[in-house]
């Protein structure tokens, strides 16, 4: 029996049998601030979620966002501030590549539980799905890392956290939630990383029906956390984006609008 633990019922959930160690484990480590990322320390005054629309350096990495290297043996996704449809956004291009971009923050999700973002994808590989390691590509992911009480970790999860800290020198987030665009998994599906229960995925877009236009999302991260993990969320320590196509070796391109938290749905 596979130790992968799908949290979705039905035929699609029953087919989830393969592990996805490298990509997701690296994302987990990356959000923990892994020293192997070889990136500069955070800029001063960057303890907030910087908006892409406020950036002035077209063609460069947005201020307060840092590269999140997923695998040193594969190409990295290219991220830059760009203009698209009359707005200043983050443009991502992956040609068989994988890497993310993250912004370190310190926020209480109970004060501002609503996470808002927009993204645009013009094409989706319908083979790609976070359910299988050999197909684990996604044109867009928005990732949130949470603090928490490590004394509540199961022995298995504690061992995983200790391994991450031993390898990286940094403490892993207590919980990592990824909002993903999947090629075929149903929306609102939830998946759990097999090696720890503290990394989970929530599918917010699926298939190609909504490609070619800007899509807007508003998610209550407190409610999503309760649904996905159970319990109450701790402080938010990082937000990241990820466009990758390293498993299927395809071209993937996306545009991310501002990512912001607020205390209301509107």
List where the protein language model places each region:
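Extracellular/luminal beta-rich ligand-recognition
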Residues: 137, 147-195
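N-terminal secretory signal peptides
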Residues: 1-17, 24-32
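Short carbohydrate-recognition loop motifs
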Residues: 77-99
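Secreted extracellular polysaccharide-interacting domains
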Residues: 92-111, 124-127, 196-204
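Extracellular beta-strand elements of beta-rich domains used
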Residues: 52, 239, 259-261
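Extracellular beta-strand ligand-recognition surfaces/modules
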Residues: 139-142, 197-207, 211-249
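Extracellular carbohydrate-recognition regions
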Residues: 35-70, 155-156, 160
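Exposed low-complexity, polar/acidic, P/S/T/G-rich flexible segments that act as propeptides
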Residues: 254-264
């Amino acid at each position: 029996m596979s130790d992968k633990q799908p949290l979705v019922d039905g035929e699609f959930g029953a087919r989830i049998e393969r592990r996805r160690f490298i990509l997701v484990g690296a994302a987990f480590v990356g959000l923990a601030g892994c020293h192997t990322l070889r990136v500069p320390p955070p800029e001063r005054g960057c303890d907030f979620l910087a908006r892409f629309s406020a950036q002035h350096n077209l063609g460069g990495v947005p201020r307060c966002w840092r590269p999140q290297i997923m695998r040193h043996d594969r190409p990295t996704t290219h991220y830059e501030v760009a203009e698209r449809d009359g707005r200043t956004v983050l443009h991502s291009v992956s040609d068989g590549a994988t890497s993310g971009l993250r912004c370190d923050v310190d926020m209480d999700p109970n004060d501002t539980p609503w996470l808002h973002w927009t993204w645009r994808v013009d094409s989706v590989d319908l083979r790609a799905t976070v359910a299988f390691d050999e197909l684990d590509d996604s044109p867009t992911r928005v990732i949130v890392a949470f603090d928490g009480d490590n004394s509540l970790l199961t022995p298995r999860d504690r061992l995983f956290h200790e391994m991450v800290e031993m390898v990286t020198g940094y403490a892993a987030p207590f919980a990592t939630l990824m909002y993903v665009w999947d090629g075929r998994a149903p929306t609102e599906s939830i998946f759990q990383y097999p090696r720890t229960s503290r990394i989970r995925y929530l599918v917010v877009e699926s298939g190609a029906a909504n490609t070619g236009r800007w899509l807007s999302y508003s998610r209550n991260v407190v409610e999503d956390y309760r649904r996905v993990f159970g319990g109450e969320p701790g402080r938010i320590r990082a937000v990241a984006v990820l466009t990758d196509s390293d498993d299927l070796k395809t071209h993937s391109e996306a545009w991310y609008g501002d990512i912001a938290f607020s205390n209301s749905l509107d």
